[in-house]
Amino acid sequence: MQLTIDAKEVEGVRVLTLSGRIVAGPEVDTVRSFVKEFLGNHWNLIVLDLANVTRIDSTGIGMLVESVILTVKEGGQLKLTRLPRLIHNILSTHRLLQAFDIYPTEADALASFAKEAI
């Protein structure tokens, strides 16, 4: 299944819902382009909803790490939500879970931005 992306804005937060594969090539490049476009427009609060991701390779994992680093450098935050077990296990195996803010639902991820603003 090719990667599809649904982008929306919720109370100043950009949410990308990803479905399909995040693998080397146009899939990773497309996600990276969205993140860079958001940051270029000073939209630096980002949530990636990964519930419907069916496959991810090392390039996809690298892109997620790179996206967090770029977002933090721009003074923003990038959070992950609804991780499939596959992605959770990969991040855990490579000791990368602590590199991400991970939430069980989109609502939880969005609410976390409001809590941090207080």
What are these regions (language model features)?
Residues 101-105:
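Short acidic-hydrophobic, aromatic-tinged amphipathic segments that line or gate anion-handling sites
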Residues 22-100:
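Amphipathic alpha-helical interaction surfaces in cytosolic regulatory modules
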Residues 1-17:
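Short beta-strand/loop segment at the start of cytosolic alpha/beta domains
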Residues 110-118:
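Short, charged, intrinsically disordered terminal tails
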Residues 13-22, 117:
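Short, low-complexity, intrinsically disordered N-terminal segments
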Residues 85, 107-108:
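Acidic phosphotransfer microenvironment of two-component signaling modules
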